C-alpha cells in the first residue's frame, strides 16, 4: 500500500484548488481523518473507499494501487 499512499498524496497536492486532508476526505464522502490515515499508511482503504477516491480524482483504481502508470 506504500504506492497507494504516495499516489494519493501526490494527487491531493496537485489538485486545484489545494485542499487539506480533512476537506478532501469530506468531499470524497469519507470520515474526516480517512485521507490522513491512508497517506500515512495507518489504514487500508475498503473497496468502497477506493471507488470514492478514484471517482473524486478521476483516476482508475488500478492507478491508485500502482498497478498501472496511466491515469
Q: What function would you assign to each model-found segment?
A:
Residues 1-17:
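A short, Lys/Arg-rich alpha-helix, primarily the initiator
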Residues 2, 14, 65-71:
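Short, charged recognition helix plus adjacent turn
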Residues 9, 21-22, 51:
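Residues within the helices of the helix-turn-helix
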Residues 12, 25, 54:
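The alpha-helix within a helix-turn-helix
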Residues 17-37:
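Short alpha-helical DNA-recognition segment
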Residues 40:
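Short, conserved catalytic or interaction motifs in soluble domains
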